[in-house]
Amino acid sequence: MDIHEVCRWTSELNVLVVEDDEVLRESFQQLLSYLFAEVDTAVDGQDAFDQWVKKQHDIVFTDLNMPRLSGFRLIEKIHQQAPQQAMVVISAYEDEIFQQALTTQQVNYLIKPVSLEGLLNVLIPVCQSLPLEHQGY
């Protein structure tokens, strides 16, 4: 599958990027803006949850270690309200057991630094799991 096919899926979706590091947040937002209709950002888990409650983004990309509300707690809070919410963790932590634990929670995993290839490999199953009305067909 190439980037054009992925763009067909993503071009009408809105996403939320949660990252406390300003440089990483802005660079990831810029990358995603080529693929998605809307890319909102949050500086921490609490800011993200407040935004998500108002907008219910199609996909949430989140770091794990953040002030006020961690990425783990954010995932838990969102999944309490919307168990099928598409979530992607963005982390430099590469431990296989850790990644498997996230997978069992219906959370996808993207390793920092984020590459276009890695992003596309995660987006394909994430987009396929979205309800049909959100798949951009």
Describe the residue ranges of each PLM region.
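Acidic catalytic/metal-coordinating carboxylates
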Residues: 44-47, 70-73
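Non-catalytic signal-transmission and effector/linker regions of two-component phosphorelay proteins
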Residues: 1-14, 117-137
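Alpha4 helix (beta4-alpha4-beta5 surface) of REC/receiver domains from two-component response regulators
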Residues: 73, 94-111, 121
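Conserved sequence signature across two-component system core domains
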Residues: 18-19, 42, 60
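Active-site residues of response regulator receiver
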Residues: 63
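Receiver (REC) domain active-site loop signature in two-component systems and cognate sites
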Residues: 66
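Two-component/phosphorelay signaling modules centered on CheY-like receiver
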Residues: 21-40
